[in-house]
């Protein structure tokens, strides 16, 4: 169940791997284990079947391939910076200058829109906000999330969350990156003012009809 050293080194170098012998889903590992167990039981070899093999099956059932789920954490302002760069590129204005109502309207419209927010090929100067390294870093994080298998990811934690738009922003960026198994979004209210406003913020989020269609 350990990753071969050569596989780890290749991944660190960013090399493409022949993944034919790599498990991608827990069922791929569980199936042969259960087959072994059933075969041992059929041969009346109960002591062997119910010893170490049973322990391995329980561990796989509990922890999967990943052993634990990975949480992602990012500050709300970084998401706002990305959306400001996007709205600048699309010539829609400056997201930073919009009030909460304008932000929610924009975010919900895009969440409900089947088309991508950005074209796949960007035509922008090197010094354009959309090409800023902090913006590209956040977008790269979401693109990385889209490549992860189901069950590998836990929660996307937003530090310094303040308003409903902070949560909607992360949902939109997941949609834009085509994350196949969107992470649940957890706003973290940290200042006293934000903590006082947290109940109203959550009530506002839950009152949005778009949330009714979420699984």
Task: Give the predicted meaning of each segment.
Residues 1-147:
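Extended, charge-enriched "interface" segments that sit outside catalytic cores
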């Amino acid at each position: 169940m350990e990753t071969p050293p050569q596989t780890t080194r290749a991944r660190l170098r960013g090399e493409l791997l022949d993944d034919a012998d790599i498990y991608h889903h827990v069922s791929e590992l569980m199936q042969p284990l259960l087959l072994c167990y059933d075969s041992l039981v059929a041969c009346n070899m109960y002591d062997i079947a119910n010893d170490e093999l049973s322990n391995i099956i329980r561990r796989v059932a509990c922890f999967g391939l990943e052993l634990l789920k990975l949480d992602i954490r990012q500050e709300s302002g970084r998401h706002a910076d990305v959306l400001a760069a996007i709205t600048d590129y699309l010539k829609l204005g400056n997201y930073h200058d919009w009030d909460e109502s304008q932000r929610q309207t924009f975010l919900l419209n895009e969440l409900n829109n089947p088309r991508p927010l950005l074209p796949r090929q960007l035509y922008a100067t090197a010094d354009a906000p959309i090409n800023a390294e902090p913006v590209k870093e956040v977008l790269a994080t979401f693109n990385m999330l889209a490549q992860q298998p189901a069950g590998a990811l836990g929660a996307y934690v937003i530090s310094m969350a303040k308003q409903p738009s902070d949560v909607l922003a992360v949902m939109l960026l997941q949609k834009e990156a085509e994350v196949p198994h969107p992470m649940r979004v957890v706003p973290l209210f940290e200042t006293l003012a934000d903590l006082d406003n947290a109940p109203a913020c959550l009530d506002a989020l839950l009152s949005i009809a778009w949330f009714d269609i979420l699984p």
